[in-house]
Amino acid sequence: ITKYKHEIMWWMSRLTIMVTSLFLSMTLAAQAYAAEIQMGSGGNLVFEPNEVTIDAGETVTFINNALPPHNIIFDKFASLSRESLMFTPGETQDIKFATAGDYSFKCAPHEGAGMKGVIHVK
């Protein structure tokens, strides 16, 4: 019976480690992801939502919803820009914002149609 008790304890310790690891990884992933912005939402040339507020260090995911091509241009923060055109619906770009401030962005091909937005970083 001691052998079985030892084996059960071994499996329980492994299960505890796995569950704890899973919980921690989910918590860390949730902390890093702050907002999702759709591009071309509802068949319109818009960012949806076109304004979000996040904390410094968080990431915004841009998703090409439809009506390609789209890109993401930050006029005052060129290093954050994603100038390459996104053609495939479902294609994503993740952008991390390390510093507090207001980050205005646009889609260069559709700026004239009003495809603009702002990310407020606290």
Labelled PLM ranges:
Residues 3-4, 29:
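Serine/threonine-rich, low-complexity intrinsically disordered segments
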Residues 1-2, 66:
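A subset of signal/propeptide-processing and intrinsically disordered low-complexity segments
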Residues 10-13, 28-122:
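Extracytoplasmic copper-binding redox domains, predominantly the cupredoxin/blue-copper superfamily
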Residues 18-27:
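Bacterial N-terminal signal peptides
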Residues 4-19:
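Bacterial N-terminal signal peptides that target proteins for export
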